[in-house]
Amino acid sequence: MMNNGTETLKEFLNYIQFERGYSAHTVTAYQHDLEKFLNFIYKYDSILLKDFGKIDRQAIRHFLGKEYEEGNSAKTVARRLASIKSLFNYLVQAEVICDNPAIHIKTPKVEKKIPTFVQENKIEELMKMPDAVTLIGKRDRAILELFYATGIRLNELAGLNIGSVNPQEKLLRVLGKGNKERIVPFGKPAKHALESYLKKRGKSWASPQETPLFTSRGDKRIAVRTIQQRVNIYLKAVLGGRTGASPHTLRHTFGTHLLENDADIRSIQELLGHSSISSTQIYTKVNPKKMIEIYRDKHPHGS
C-alpha cells in the first residue's frame, strides 16, 4: 500500500476509535476491510492513492466484483462496501475530496437468518448448569443471568465495573456503542447471582468505578474470548449442540421473550440500546420510567 493510503487509513481509524468511540473489535474490522480495498486499488492503479478524489465508482465496483470472485458471501461484500462508504464520508467531511464515489453503489442483499434463541422453558436448565459452589461457577451463573436479564452485548458485559451495578435499585449502567451510556434494569435472579458471586470473591474494592465486575485468574478483567467460550459451552448443552450459539444468543433470547410477553417493540429497542430503526424513531422514544415498568412486568426474570 502506498504511503498516502497508509496515512489516510491511519487517520480514519484514529477518528472512528477516539472521536466516534468505536470498539477495538469494530476498528479492527474496518482496518481489515480497508487494507484489502487499498491494496486492491494500489494494484489496480497505484496513482489513485496519491489522490483519493480520483478513485471512482468503477474502481470500487471492480473491487467488489473481485471479492465475489474470491468466494466471499454477500454479507462480507456488504460489510466491505459499508467500510468503504464510511472512509469516503470521512474524507468528504475532512474536505480531502468533494464527493463520495461509493454513495450510490447499492448494498448487496443479505438474507436475514432467524436468530437462535433459548426457549423460555429451557432458561432454568441453562442457569443451573454452572457449578453452584466454585467461584468460576458462580461467576458464570452471574454472567448468564445478566446476559439474559439485560440483553447487553458481549463487549458491554466484559467492560462492566463493580460501580456499574446498583443492586438496591436493580439497575445497570452500560456503556454501549459510540460510548453511549444507558440504564438497563434487571431482576431478582440476576441480583442474587451477582451477590453470590461477589460474596464468594470476598474482597473489598477501594475504587469500584474502576474495578472489573467479572474477572479471571489474577483478578484481571475477564477476556471477551473467555466469556464466549464459557457461555458457548452452556448454550450448546441446552440447545442440543446446535451450531450458532453464542453470547449474542442470550441477547436475542432477551428480546424474543419480551416480545412474546407483549412488550412494546420500541421499549425493547431502548432496552437493547439499538440505534433508531427509522428517521421518525426519535419522536417515539418512551419515558425511561415507563420503560422500566414495562420491563418489570413483561420479562420473565424482571421482578
Predicted regions and their residues:
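Conserved catalytic core of the tyrosine transesterase superfamily
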Residues: 1-303
